[in-house]
């Protein structure tokens, strides 16, 4: 039932956007662990829909190291020059905030609520992404 409601809410948003941008993104970052840090990287394909009221919907999915797959969905404020996005990463599950500059440079901060993943006790994740 929750999935149906989500589809009914998101589907109209996807079709009435002012502009759309499909992109590839390379990300690299550091997971903050109990005993230090661990590097990671991902390659994602995503889409950003910009709306007339200065809001946006950004979603992406792809391959990652060490989690193999990843994806995230975010809602934000801004335009192609500067945007702030708040969302949720599907795997590993965690909320995030992302700052996007000129649609190309993205900095995200993610906090693991349960402090654990299949790969250990991760507290947070800090990433930089470059879109092309």
Describe the residue ranges of each PLM region.
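Outer-membrane beta-barrel "beta-signal"
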Residues: 119-132
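A general lysine-centric signal
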Residues: 2-3, 47
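Transmembrane beta-strand segments that form the barrel wall of outer-membrane beta-barrel proteins
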Residues: 22-33, 54-66, 73-97, 105-115
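Membrane-embedded beta-strands of outer-membrane beta-barrel proteins
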Residues: 43-45, 71-73, 95-99, 126-128
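Sec-dependent N-terminal signal peptides
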Residues: 3-15
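N-terminal targeting signals for Sec/Tat export/insertion, comprising classic cleavable signal peptides
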Residues: 26-52
